[in-house]
């Protein structure tokens, strides 16, 4: 990883000269290191190397949990893959049981994994945070008559997304649940990319015990079917988890292409936009604001009009944060009854979506257990304030 020459051929008896020669040469190399099954490389000027961001110090992994690496290939450019993560509203359409044609269910919907709350259309609130370096995507949805679920996804420039618990049913109070997926969207070329990252698995985050380590790895992901070109019957029908099966040349070359159209997953939704989506053909609603806000943050960073997101300022910020910046990523279930009127319910959803982000912003100056206690205390106060106002 540092270009060191490991050995040179030399005749017996000339070992000393061979060793001197070996130590005198070095191949050009990029600095690389391994972390929990993933290899990271720094490819910029050595004198400008930023610290590796250990989000929250340990990626919020509980002692009972672990980081499980995965690599998922995508037949399109990286930006529209990242768009999918910023589009927090899409779960109610793409991943809803009612969208599957002819009841040909294949595991692509949240209802099939007992997390129907994710199929409820949320009220969305998008806020650029951390000096314009990232975006907090706060969605408020009613999970049952006694609970309101606020899920905050964190999109970090240029290609990182931090996802809260993906199997939340929203039927039990939970404040400040943390990372369930950590994902970097990495370009391969203009027309292909990879999703590389970790799935956090264990009883700390997976309170419903539905995660499956045996389905996380190369060209496979456990939380919903349809994340990669190969569906599970093809991925595991002939291959083991540790194998590296061939990837189809394109999405239409798959033998199960037609079957996948009955129950499309994220892969189908992303890839079917072309290898490079034409933005001029889009028909956005207000709930797509997160996609457009993230694109603008990225565009401004590239153009230099978002100076905080420049490589130099980003590195400076990471050093100031001790290479362990805080994240807005969180899953929160409040014990709050349904509004007495539709207007009251809508007002409540929007209020909670905004206030949760404000609480997380107020906690940016503290770290670790102190921050966790601060956030939970403020969220308890938020719930009490809503209930008190309801009783007045």
Region annotations inferred by a language model:
Residues 1-45:
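Active-site-proximal cofactor/substrate-binding loop regions of enzyme domains
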């Amino acid at each position: 990883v540092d270009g060191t020459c490991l050995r040179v051929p030399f005749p017996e008896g000339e070992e000393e000269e061979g060793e001197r020669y070996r130590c005198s040469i070095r191949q050009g190399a990029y600095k690389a290191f391994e972390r929990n099954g993933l290899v990271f490389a720094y490819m910029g000027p050595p004198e400008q190397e930023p610290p590796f961001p250990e989000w929250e110090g340990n990626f919020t992994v509980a002692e009972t949990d672990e980081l499980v690496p995965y690599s998922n290939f995508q037949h399109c450019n990286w930006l529209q893959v990242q768009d999918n993560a910023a589009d927090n509203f899409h779960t109610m359409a793409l991943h809803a049981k009612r969208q599957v044609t002819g009841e040909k269910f294949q595991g692509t919907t949240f209802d099939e994994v007992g997390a129907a709350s994710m199929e409820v259309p949320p009220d969305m609130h998008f806020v650029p945070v951390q000096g314009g370096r990232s975006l907090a995507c706060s969605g408020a949805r009613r999970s049952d008559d006694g609970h309101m679920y606020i899920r905050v996804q964190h999109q970090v420039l240029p290609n990182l997304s931090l996802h809260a618990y993906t199997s939340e049913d929203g039927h039990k109070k939970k404040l400040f649940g943390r990372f369930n997926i950590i994902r970097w969207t990495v370009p391969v070329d203009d027309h292909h990319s990879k999703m590389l990252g970790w799935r956090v698995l264990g009883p700390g985050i997976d309170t419903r015990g539905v995660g499956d380590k045996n389905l996380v790895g190369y060209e496979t992901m456990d939380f919903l079917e349809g994340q990669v070109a190969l569906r599970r019957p093809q991925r595991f029908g002939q291959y083991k988890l540790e194998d590296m099966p061939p990837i189809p040349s394109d999405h239409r070359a798959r033998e199960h292409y037609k079957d996948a159209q009955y129950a499309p997953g994220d892969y189908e939704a992303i890839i079917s936009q072309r290898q490079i989506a034409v933005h001029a053909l889009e028909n956005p609603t207000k709930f797509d604001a997160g996609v457009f806000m993230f694109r603008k943050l990225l565009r401004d960073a590239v153009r230099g009009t978002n100076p905080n997101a420049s490589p130099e300022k980003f590195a400076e910020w990471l050093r100031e944060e001790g290479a362990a910046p805080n994240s807005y990523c969180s899953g929160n279930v409040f014990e709050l009854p349904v509004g007495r009127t539709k207007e009251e319910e809508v007002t409540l959803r929007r209020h909670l979506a905004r206030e949760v982000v404000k609480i997380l912003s107020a906690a940016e100056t503290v770290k670790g257990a102190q921050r966790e206690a601060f956030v939970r205390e403020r969220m308890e106060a938020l719930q009490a304030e809503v209930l008190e106002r309801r009783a007045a």
